[in-house]
A protein has these predicted regions:
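Hydrophobic, aromatic-enriched alpha-helical segments typical of multi-pass transmembrane helices
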Residues: 2-259
């Protein structure tokens, strides 16, 4: 003799097992969107320390810069979060490439955090040695500008370089698995070499890092990351052989032995 579970419980169980990867898709998509929400305001907020060579000896806007550094740290964490959320899914397509994607995101986050720490050091110098004059002021300015230069290099080698490798690895995984419409990873795969071109041109001084040419070359990768974030957040994954198969029995009424 069996007792059939209530309909509400059955419906809940069916809904919970219908799409076991939905939470991974939503989490990854939200992390990708948070990258834009955090990185763009961060770049604006840290503007004073980046563009004022005398920031360390002047009345710096420390609170504003600190908020920008905090958002940059959030940006680094979202990179790690997206990789952690996607790995259990994309490893079903190719484990080595999935590990490569996680590694590239971790490296990107680490480089970003180095830049954050360098700007925090500038703020600390300004607060500890405010009002210094003469040789002390000159030394502070040289030190602070060196730290800002360090941050600029991390920006080039982190957000300026690693997204190209991310696009190649994740774009290939998503294209082959068809977890999202193929047009989305195609944009990333096209944009990756363009971003690498922009990075190398900037590295060797052919173009400025903040220029119209650099902006055009980086746009496809930005479009890829934004579109894949939107799709995974609101649509989830497209049915694919790499997704786990749901046993139809899991969606039926739950039977319990009679007492």
């Amino acid at each position: 003799m069996t007792i059939t579970a209530p309909a509400a419980t059955t419906a809940h169980a069916a809904g919970a097992t219908t799409d076991p990867m939905r939470n991974h898709a939503r989490a990854a998509g939200i992390f990708y969107l948070l990258t834009f929400v955090s990185s763009i305001p961060a770049l604006i907020l840290i503007g004073p320390v980046l563009h004022n060579p005398d920031y360390v000896t002047s009345g710096g806007q420390d609170t504003r810069v600190l908020w920008g550094c905090l958002l940059d740290a959030v940006n680094a964490l979202t990179a790690v979060g997206s990789a952690v959320a996607l790995y259990p899914v994309v490893k079903r397509q190719n484990r080595s490439m999935a590990l490569g994607f996680v590694t590239s995101r971790l490296l990107e986050a680490a480089v970003v955090m180095i830049g954050v720490v360098s700007l925090l050091a500038v703020v600390t110098l300004r607060q500890d040695f405010a009002g210094s004059t003469g040789g002390d002021a000159a030394s502070l300015t040289v030190t602070a500008n060196a730290l800002v230069d360090l941050r600029n290099w991390t920006f080039l080698l982190g957000p300026g370089l690693m997204p190209a490798f991310n696009a190649i690895l994740l774009g290939t995984l998503l294209y082959r698995s068809r977890l999202v419409p193929r047009i989305i990873p195609t944009v990333g795969l096209i944009g990756a070499p363009l971003l690498l071109t922009a990075m190398l041109a900037t590295f060797f001084g052919a173009i400025d890092q903040v220029s119209s040419v650099a902006g055009i070359l980086t746009l496809p990768v930005a479009a890829w990351e934004f579109s894949v974030g939107l799709w995974m957040t609101f649509k989830g994954f497209t049915p694919s052989p790499v997704l786990p198969t749901i046993d139809p029995a899991d969606t039926k009424a739950v039977a319990h032995p009679a007492v």
